């Protein structure tokens, strides 16, 4: 509750649960509060990796506009666009300023960072790169860095992508001289884009970026993405009583939760899934008024909100038109 006000009790489960489930529910609730901007008490509670988890940063991400394969092939032929591999991680902002490393999620809220990654960021600072901001995908044990927003205290957001990427080239050269290149990886520009090859070899997709496109918040026609399979954020409705699977649902235009089938809960999931969790699933297509076809669990999304689990994000199977 609010500091200085009375605490409020709220029953989280209708019946007793195991310690494992209770711990998972606690962690989920804690992350939701931090995601919404709450911080811990000054009386001594701390957060692993950062003392201000959940605090708002100045990160406002440039998001990719989805396109189909026809549009992608047009962009491949357009000399005003370049391409990069799209990696399936979690959006991560990295800033180094005044000797401090800050990480933020897609919502712009500060999150913890792994010690190994912090050391790699500090290595760059020791090589003479100061006051920089990187835009990355967090792959768990390493980062895929695809853009740079500032360096040496100079804001690059108003520069074109090609000019920004030149600064990443200098960083890549420094990283190659050490083991830190395996932790902070630079997403290269593709000189040739073979969609069939990328699809056949299991890549998530490809991004297209206008060479003179500035870095802006939100989506525009300067950055596109083509994904080789569909991805959706859904909410866990319930767990199956006897199988390792969960029922999943999305929010429709009437603000009602609608079931879209079940997905298997893998054995290596970071923690047991519980009702109310937001997760990403991959699928081939969705049936109108039905379920997702061949969904597979991708990852837990503690960085998103329920308003991100919308039915409007689903890609539905095309149906034959009546003659």
Residue ranges, per PLM feature:
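Conserved, charged/glycine-enriched, solvent-exposed linker/hinge segments
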Residues: 42-82
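Intrinsically disordered, low-complexity regulatory tails
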Residues: 1-48, 142-156, 160, 254-323
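A short, polar/proline- and glycine-enriched secondary-structure boundary/capping micro-motif
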Residues: 4-11, 110-116, 247
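Generic, well-ordered alpha-helical scaffold segments in large soluble proteins
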Residues: 25-32, 170-174, 201
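Nucleic-acid 5′ end/cap handling module spanning
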Residues: 65-108, 176-303, 323
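TOPRIM metal-binding catalytic domain and adjacent DNA-binding surface shared by DnaG-type primases
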Residues: 53-59, 144, 150, 171-190
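Short glycine-rich, low-complexity/disordered patches
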Residues: 36-46, 131-136, 177-188
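Covalent nucleotidyltransferase
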Residues: 72-178
